[in-house]
Structures are given as C-alpha cells and as structure tokens.
From Swiss-Prot:
GO molecular function: transmembrane transporter activity
Key word DNA repair present: no
InterPro entries: MFS (IPR011701), MFS_dom (IPR020846), MFS_trans_sf (IPR036259)
Residue ranges crossing the lipid bilayer per the database entry: 5-25, 44-64, 73-93, 96-116, 135-155, 158-178, 192-212, 220-240, 260-280, 299-319, 327-347, 357-377, 391-411, 469-489
Gene coding for it: smvA
Keywords, in A-Z order: Cell inner membrane, Cell membrane, Membrane, Transmembrane, Transmembrane helix, Transport
Family assignment from sequence similarity: Belongs to the major facilitator superfamily. TCR/Tet family.
Protein name (database record): Methyl viologen resistance protein SmvA
Source taxonomy: Bacteria, Pseudomonadati, Pseudomonadota, Gammaproteobacteria, Enterobacterales
Amino acid sequence: MFRQWLTLVIIVLVYIPVAIDATVLHVAAPTLSMTLGASGNELLWIIDIYSLVMAGMVLPMGALGDRIGFKRLLMLGGTLFGLASLAAAFSHTASWLIATRVLLAIGAAMIVPATLAGIRATFCEEKHRNMALGVWAAVGSGGAAFGPLIGGILLEHFYWGSVFLINVPIVLVVMGLTARYVPRQAGRRDQPLNLGHAVMLIIAILLLVYSAKTALKGHLSLWVISFTLLTGALLLGLFIRTQLATSRPMIDMRLFTHRIILSGVVMAMTAMITLVGFELLMAQELQFVHGLSPYEAGVFMLPVMVASGFSGPIAGVLVSRLGLRLVATGGMALSALSFYGLAMTDFSTQQWQAWGLMALLGFSAASALLASTSAIMAAAPAEKAAAAGAIETMAYELGAGLGIAIFGLLLSRSFSASIRLPAGLEAQEIARASSSMGEAVQLANSLPPTQGQAILDAARHAFIWSHSVALSSAGSMLLLLAVGMWFSLAKAQRR
C-alpha cells in the first residue's frame, strides 16, 4: 500500500510542472516582449505552440508507453522536459524559445499518458484508483489555473527564465524517485505508434493557424496565404481519410458521428478557448495599460482561477439535477454575458465589478467543461471509453492553443485598426507601433520621452478599445454557440 501511494506522489510531482507550463507564460507575455524583443506574432507562437504540439503528440506517446512500459516513458518524458526547460530558461531569441517550447510539449505529451497508465497499473481496486485519478485531475486543473499566479510571483523576484528553471529540480527529484521506487512494466511490442499520423495532424493544425494569423496581419501575399491554407486543409482531410481507412487509427473518427460526443468535444474546446484566451488578454492589459506587475496581475485574475477550481463539485450536482443540456448551454450563455460585462468594465476603477464578472466567467466556463466530460464519457460505448477520453484530452489541448490564437488575432486586428499615432513618425515606425501593444512599448522606449509618451498613450487607448472588441466578439460567438448547442443536444436526446 505504501508503494502505491508513493507512486502516486511521484506521478503528481512530475505532472505539476506540465500543468503549470500550459498557462505560466500568460503573465510573462509583456516581459518576454520587452526582454526578447518578440513581435506580437512571435509572442502568440511562444505561448500557444505548447498546447498545439501536445494536442497532436499525446495519443502516439500513449501508444509508445504501451510498447515500452509507463516507467520508461515517464523517465524519457521527464528527462526531455527537464532539458527543454533548461534550454528555454536561457533563450536569447524568440525563435529559440519557440523551439524549446516544442520540445517541452513533446516531453509533456510523454508524461501525461505515462502518469495515467501508472495510476491504472498501480491501483487495482476501483475505489483507490478513482481516488488517485481525482488527485491527478485536481493537480492538473489546479496547476493550470494557478500557473499565471506562480509565474507572476517568480517574475516579481527573479529572472524571467525562472518560470522554466523551477521545473529542473522537480524533474531531477522525480527521476531519482522513479528509478528507485516505481516498478517496471512489460511493454506490448505489437502496439502501433501512429507517429506519422501525429506529425500529419500537427503540421495541418500549425499551417491552418499560421495562415489565419498571417491573413489577419497582412504580412504575406494572398497567394502564399492561400497556398498555406490549402495545404493545411488538404493535410487535415488526408489525416481524416487515413483514420477512417486504417483498422487501428490514432483517433476513432467514427465517434464523431455521435451527436452528443461531437457536442461534448465542441464544448470542451470552447471552454478552454474561453478560459485560456481571456487569461492571456487580461495579463497583457493589466500590465501594459494599468501598470501592474506580473505578480499583481496574477493576483487580480485570482477570481477566475478560484471559481473555475470550485465549480467542479457544484457543476456535477447541477448536471445530475438539471441535466446536461441545461448546464452545458447555460454555462456558455453565462460565459457570453460575462464577456459582455467585462467588455464594458474599467479595470482601474471598477475592480469589484471586474472580479465578480471574472468569477462568473470562471465558474460558467469550467461548468461547461465538466458538462463536456460528462457528455463524452456517458455517450461513448464501454469498449471505446479510452478512445473517447483521448479525444477529450486532445480537445482540451487544442482548445488551449486555439484560445491564444483566436483571442490574439481578435486583439491584434482591432488594435491595428484603432490606434491613432502622433504625427512625425516614419512609415516603419508606424507599422511597428500598429502591430501590437508590446511592439508599441518597445518603440516608445527607444524614442525621446515626449514622443514616446504620446505613442504609449495612443497604444493604451487602442488596447482598451481592442479589449472591448475582442471580448464582445467572443461573447457573441459563445452566445450563438450556446443556441446551436441547445438545439443540437435536444435532437440528440430525442433519438
């Protein structure tokens, strides 16, 4: 019994930095922009590449664990995660940091299925296994929720690379404990890896996201954007066709023909897009516009984190009493109303109103997330429960990556359209200041004080307006989705 719970402690320890790294850079965005000279586009890639790559790699890494055993996979993933953290901490350019974040994502994609497989292999009794899974889930949601606060504390007192360096001692301790105490398991050599399918999916996702970002930025010619978009769409279509044709697919695409499962996947992605995208937007506004430190920004956003953490048990009861359809659509509708309210809130003078709306957003979005889990797990056939769970995991990670991309694009587009810069700037300076808030601040710091202050004032006014546009747009999309989900789930329940 002692060895079982020691294994759980080891699993939880290694999972903590994986969960935190998904959100820890949200409050670090302004710091990275200034320190590395990252453009707005580079900043989005630094943050969202982690979730996008992890979404495509988590399933084949799970298959690799079946082949070599979860202990070896945990050792391999932990080692890669630790080395990538060390490399990321001493990045001197945005491109290098993006590359190390890719390696971090691959390491994390090994760790997540290894920890779940470890729990299944270690806890034979259902009661103990469910308890262990509950601890694992709490650590995952808690780590992601408090990532911005932890990042803020570290940035307040240490070098920005400390948000990555903190992973290294944790990994070293876990690797030592794993080697000494975790038993080795026999692998199944016949398990297919589907690495080619995973690479195809990741490239398709990255090409589609890249084409969307560059189209709205207007940095490339129309034919280059069209070619990138078409290539991504063709690769995605080829991936789907391959999954349907093979006898042992990476993703069981036939599960998407079930209306409730499809609705659950959409809800999971939407909830993650909402929470992650909002955190990134808020972190930038609080620091760039209102002058808060990273730590103060993390504290200001606590209502979202706390409310989302406490929503689980309450939302579970609500699903049982009110039904999946009402909780799911109600959660999205309340999230939309929260966005509308926050779009009209002045964060410098209406803090209590902002905190109340953020708490409502955290609770409602997390409730929709729990409803999505209930929908997927309840609708999936027993023999396909693992495949359904894998799809849900991918939806979470993909939603996190898309949340950063979507909110970043909305913010960037409205910022560029609304900024009114002072006269006397060269064309290159105008293009740079109009690109993003971070680049406007970089330019202002390089110019004489009077001219720099005029640019800062213009950028802050534009960012506040852009914040309202982005939140209102997101609220409208959520409201339309809630209406669509209401009718979709009604049709599914009548079948």
